[in-house]
Amino acid sequence: YGFSLGLQMMTGLMGDTDEKCIKTAERLIALSPDTVRIYPTIVLENTPLADYLRDGSYRAETLNEAVSLCARLLLMFRENNIKVIRLGLHSGGNVDEGYLAGAYHPAFRELCEGKIYLEKMLSELSKLPKDMPYVIEVPEKSIGKAKGQNKRNEKALLNNGFQCKIKGNEFLNDYDIKITEDI
């Protein structure tokens, strides 16, 4: 028909739960859009949501909560060949000045993708002995995401008892990993 369908969803709205967001994502997937945008709710000064936050009738989604949920959503859309073209608000405009609460981070998508890699690495490593060093290969372009912002994923692997080196592999697809013993 000469056009593409792009849909948007928000997480962390009043009365929202992770389960409701997953249901929303499933409904969006059923519509077979070409693209999706996902925006965690943030609270800005001088808005009704700011009043609800102050009177206790609304609790803003934390950054960690939003990262965990949006990482799941990102994988859901990817598994259905739907491109997520935006994940989180970009800085600028009134966001920086009026921000009160909610999941706002200038590198929000990177945090979500880092979470995906961390969960995959920990899941695979949990099947292996902890007393040996490993090499974890990830897509070449995703080394930074796999290591995590400020190397948080590398630290988490170490805190879980795994000594790992993360290296690039140009033949792996997004979010795929390969673990071998470091000889």
Predicted segments with their positions:
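C-terminal scaffold of the Radical SAM
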Residues: Y1-M132
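Radical SAM enzyme core and accessory elements
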Residues: G93-I183
